[in-house]
Structure formats: structure tokens, C-alpha cells
Amino acid sequence: MKFIDEARIEVIAGQGGAGSASMRREKFIEFGGPDGGDGGKGGSVWATADRNINTLIDYRYAKTHTAKNGEPGRGADCYGRAGDDIELRMPVGTIISDYETGEPIADLTTHGERLCLAQGGVGGWGNIHFKSSTNRAPRQKTNGKSGERRKLKLELKVLADVGLLGMPNAGKSTLITAVSNARPKIADYPFTTLHPNLGVVRVGSERSFVIADIPGLIEGAAEGAGLGHRFLRHLQRTGVLLHLVDIAPFDANVDPVADAAAIVNELRKYDEALVEKPRWLVLNKVDIIPEEGRKKVVSDFVKKFKWKGPVFEISALTGMGCDKLCYSLQDYLDSIRRDRDDAGERAQDPRYQDQPEDKNQIKYFTCALL
């Protein structure tokens, strides 16, 4: 299936049905009075997050989605039937915003999450609402209200714990194949990966995380070189980035340090927040380097690249070092989740609310709790 991560649609809710201005007419009832029912409510347009969908291709060509109108009211105080709602199923991770103003409307991050995109119009009143002591036979009625109409932009950002980035042919697809259940296309030419791939990495029976592989970046991606940098949006939700570097390129003219620096530069051009995100350096294809000279090659690269963070040496093809990398990632992600849960519990705990600003008082308060 073709991967589409952007779409523009128009949603039109149904119009409410008109009220009825009928009079009660029955045998032996001379002055029946008004009995016009109300019009039915117009159908609404809903969006629902579905984890079984991973692309917005359904909305690339079907751009207009219209709900049904409500039916008019009838005599004998019969209300009109409400228009049927329509449901638009979207991938988890879809961001919905107003196309004309750019204002964000919703971020569907949970399976089954539901949102009303366009509210159906209210049905009109029948003449039964207008009778009074001075007007026993009203002919007034009201028409139904129009439903909401909106132009929306849909943008998909995949939900993953770990994101892979690097130059084309750095071995990203090989790595995600080696450690997860994903099976992306792998070949010996640049830009084999044309769209993001997701894989689930299982570390033990009850521990796992999701890893995302995006198309490779090259220098000038911000200006549209290669496949550009539009796929970088899929890394914005990740907890940690793996910067994959081909430490032993076959082309002697290729400088791994310059390539790695170019990737960081492209990240900065796209979003400064991505540069600040936790990033680990993963040196791939170390099995090609003779073991006696491997340590020096790695240390020279780290020194020239001026890297201060975690460094992992792997071979995605043979699996060397992949287990250590996966276990380290799982431990790191677990620690992030624990910190997040602790912060949430602390925010909800009344003992930590409205604490005094004075440091001495805070220390005393904490000791009292212990």
C-alpha cells in the first residue's frame, strides 16, 4: 500500500430538517390544534483513531465527506429522522488542523479516540411550539440550521519510541530488520527506503519498544535535495534518536565525520528541538574493520566528530552488538516511563501542592513526611 502522510479534506455536516406546520384533523374533533413535529438533526462527521491503519491514502483522493441531512417533521407530532453520522477512520498519530488558519484541532494519539469534526445542524421547530392562549392555530415553523463546514489538513506523525536517522545506505533498514519484525526493502543503492517503516523490538517476554526507520538524509535536504526532510516529522514523537553512521564506507572519498555532521546540520535546519532530543551514536559495519585496528578507528571518529554521548559499535548485517544496543534502549525507555509516571503521581499528590518557597521550610516539610 502506498504511504501517504499528508492530506487535505473538506467535511460537511448535515442540515437539520424543517419543522412541520400541520393541524390535527380527526373525525369528531372540530378544533384539533397544531400537531407539527420538529425536524430531525443533521448528521455529524466524526474522526476515529484506528491502529490498524497506517496511511492517509484514503483521504488523498476522497477529499469531500458529507453527512446526511435530517428529515422534515410531519403531522401527528412526528419528529423527522436524524441524519446518519459518518465516521472517518484515521491512523493513530494523525494531527488535525484547520486548513485556512493553521490552528491545531486535535492530535489522535490513542486507539479508539473519537472527535467530532463537524457538528450537524439542529432541526427546525414544528408549529406545536408556537401555540398559546392567544394563538390557538399557529402557522409558524422554523427551518433547520445548517451543519458545520470545515476545510482540514491531516498530517501523520508515526508513534515510535526510537527513531533511526542517517545517510542513505548507512544500514538503517538492515538494522530494523535485524532487531524487529519489520521487513523493509534492502538494496545496495541509495534511497531504497521511500517511506517510514515501523518495527516492534521485543526484549524479553514482557518488554518491547517501537522503532521507526525513515528515508535517508543527505546534505541539502532542507532545500529539497534527495527526498528532502519532510519525513523528519516522524521523529518528533520519539524518546531517543539513533544516529547511524557507516564507519567503513567502500568509497574512499566518503568522509564519515563530514556525513555525520551534515545530518546534525539538517536536523537543526528542520527543527532545533530534534537536535536537543536524546541522541545516541551507532557506528555500523565495524565488522569490516580488522579487530586490531577497530578501537583506534572508533576513537578517532568520536574525537573528530566531537561526540560526548553514548557510542555503540554494531554490525547490523551479522547482528554483532545489536543485543547490547536493544537492551540499553529498553532500559533507557523504561527509566523515562518511570520518571514520567512518578512526575504524574507527584503532581496529583496533595502533599506536594502549595509547598512553601523557602528552601529551609521545604527541607523541614520533607523530613516531617519521612
Curated annotation (Swiss-Prot):
Classify the source by domain of life.
Bacteria
Q: What is stated as this protein's family in its record?
A: Belongs to the TRAFAC class OBG-HflX-like GTPase superfamily. OBG GTPase family.
A cellular component term, taken from the record's GO annotations? cytoplasm
In the record, biological process GO terms are: ribosome biogenesis
Q: Which residues form the OBG-type G domain?
A: 160-334
Q: Where does Mg(2+) bind?
A: S173, T193
Sites where the protein binds GTP = 166-173, 191-195, 213-216, 284-287, 315-317
Q: Where is this region: Disordered?
A: 129-148
Compartments where located = Cytoplasm
EC assignment: the record states: 3.6.5.-
Q: Which GO terms describe its molecular function?
A: GTP binding; GTPase activity; magnesium ion binding
The record, for HAMAP family, names: GTPase_Obg
Top enzyme class, one word, equals hydrolase
Name of the protein this chain belongs to = GTPase Obg
Instruction: Please report the stretch or stretches of sequence annotated as the Obg domain.
Output: 1-159
Q: Which cofactor does it need?
A: Mg(2+)
Q: Where is the composition biased (Polar residues)?
A: 130-145
Is GTP-binding found in the keyword set? yes
- Describe its assembly: Monomer.
Q: What does this protein do?
A: An essential GTPase which binds GTP, GDP and possibly (p)ppGpp with moderate affinity, with high nucleotide exchange rates and a fairly low GTP hydrolysis rate. Plays a role in control of the cell cycle, stress response, ribosome biogenesis and in those bacteria that undergo differentiation, in morphogenesis control.
Q: Which UniProt keywords apply?
A: Cytoplasm, GTP-binding, Hydrolase, Magnesium, Metal-binding, Nucleotide-binding
Q: What is its main location?
A: cytoplasm
